[in-house]
């Protein structure tokens, strides 16, 4: 059995990496080539900024390439509990922030035509006990009232049809979640950032940075550069 992440093991090679010396000066230096860093670099490059991504290993080589491959809506805490503790407005804002994040990922895939097997199957939260189902029913009703009319409460029979198991008493289906091959997504995102002008240096560890006139001096394992931000 291999120790490499399945996503990384089956991702295409990244062809857009810089092989030469670091640039002497850029508008923005991004530390880390995970999803967040690559998405930021792409967005900045599209706005006309000069951007360098400094990645100690390979792009998406850590948490971004080692996860469940899911991009889901919904809050980790029970929505009914969240609404009760924070109020409907804040709970709704949290829920909608997750929905916006999922849509941002979907939009990236569509805009850059990233082949990552994206599927919008939704997320199913399962009830292992009758009391769990009762809680899901209350949560479902509140979500429908406050923020998402498309959420659906599934019976035990409907849940069995979804998961091919009779062990559950029902489930809560939130339709906006997506699943994808995160290795292909990450490499596709890196290729897109590079295509739009971001300079991506792999195997380049940032050792420290210091504020100086007009920005920062960023020191790496492959030399130093000046970044405005």
Regions found by a protein language model. Give the residues of each.
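Extreme N-terminal leader/targeting segments of oxidoreductases
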Residues: 1-28, 46
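Glycine-rich FAD pyrophosphate-binding loop
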Residues: 46-66
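Dinucleotide-binding Rossmann-like beta1-alpha1 core, especially the glycine-rich loop
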Residues: 74-157
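Short phosphate-binding/catalytic loops that engage adenosine nucleotides
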Residues: 49, 148-149, 198
């Amino acid at each position: 059995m291999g120790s490499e992440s399945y996503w990384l093991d089956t991702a295409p090679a990244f062809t857009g990496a810089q092989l030469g010396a670091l640039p002497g000066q850029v508008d923005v230096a991004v530390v880390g080539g995970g999803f967040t860093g690559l998405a930021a670099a792409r967005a900045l490059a599209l706005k006309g900024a000069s951007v360098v991504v400094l990645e100690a290993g390979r792009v998406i080589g850590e948490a971004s390439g080692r996860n469940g491959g899911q991009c889901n809506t919904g809050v980790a805490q029970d929505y009914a509990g969240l609404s009760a503790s924070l109020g409907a407005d804040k709970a709704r804002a949290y829920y909608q922030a997750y929905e916006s994040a999922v849509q941002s990922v979907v939009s990236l895939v569509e805009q850059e035509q990233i082949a990552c097997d994206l599927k919008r199957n939704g997320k199913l939260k399962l009830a292992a006990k009758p009391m769990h189902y009762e809680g899901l029913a209350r949560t479902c009703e509140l979500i429908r009232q406050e923020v998402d009319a498309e959420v659906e409460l599934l019976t035990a029979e409907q849940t069995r049809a979804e998961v091919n198991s009779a062990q559950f008493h029902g489930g809560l289906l939130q339709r906006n979640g997506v699943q994808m091959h995160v290795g292909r997504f990450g490499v596709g995102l890196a290729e897109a950032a590079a295509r739009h002008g971001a300079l991506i240096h792999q195997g380049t560890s940032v050792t420290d940075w210091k504020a100086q006139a007009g920005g920062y001096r960023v020191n790496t394992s492959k030399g130093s550069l000046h970044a405005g931000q």
